[in-house]
Amino acid sequence: MLCRAYGKINLSLDINGVREDGYHTLESIFLPIDFYDLVDIEKADEMSFSSNKYYIRYNESNTIRKAIELMKNEFNIKDNFKIDLKKYIPTQAGLAGGSADGSATIKALNHLYDLNLSKDKIQELCMKIGSDVLFTYYHKPALVSGIGEKIEFIDVKKDYYVLLIKPKYGVSTKECYSLMNLDTCVHPDIHKLKEVLENGEDFISYLGNSMEDAAISLVPEIADAKKDLLDSGAPFALMSGSGSTVFTMSEDEELIKNIYKKLENKNYFLRYAKVLKNKRNW
């Protein structure tokens, strides 16, 4: 079973608290994009894992492995699997590639074994793997809050095109959180942003990312990427998630393509994408 594992951008991210268990709480507009990994899972006599990227290991931190082991335990699945991951979304990028791989695995096994998982069970399983996994299961525009378990789908009025620009180095989410100061970081108005997106109005004045300053202290090249985007004519430049990817977005597809051309000879990972507005399961 071949599944697409769609990435996302955070069109503003507000880290607004820390729970007693140490988890940070957030409010954010998550937008899925048509940039994805491919997860192929088949029943097999023995467990095997392969990937087109040499650095991807089938270890305890691998979200596909987490999902496989979780599903086997939850539903008494005895089979082994042949797993192949075509990895295109960069790691430590703030694009939820690993989370999407985990949710794609849950989808695949849900289909292979006709489990007919309820929404509550899907939420339970996804949250056991990671905070962005539930959103990537549905990959539909949403206001996400709590620690990722609260999802309110939104109707984005216009079509948008995105340019992703990632420096060479990634950001450790754990390290980034440890450097944050919730009293001094930016706290964008996520609910106002939701409102203007649903009305098709200008959203740029409502953008912000609470984690950006901390991430730049770890990877200063993020600031360079933002400057290069703006110098190339981007309407704005914002970091996604905990970084290190920076992006811009516009309803003007030609503008995004022209910015891509201006930056394609620089030492960045570049990707043009479109925001997904409708639910896609596979």
Which residues make up each language-model segment?
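ATP-binding N-lobe of GHMP and related small-molecule kinases
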Residues: 1-93, 111, 115-120, 156, ...
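Conserved, helical-rich catalytic subdomain that frames metal- and/or nucleotide-binding sites
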Residues: 49, 138, 143-236, 251-264, ...
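DPxDG-like acidic metal-binding loop motif
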Residues: 93-124, 135
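Glycine-rich beta-strand-to-loop/alpha-helix junction loops that act as flexible
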Residues: 97-98, 239-244
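Short, well-structured alpha-helical segments that form the helix of a local strand-helix-strand
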Residues: 118-129, 257-261
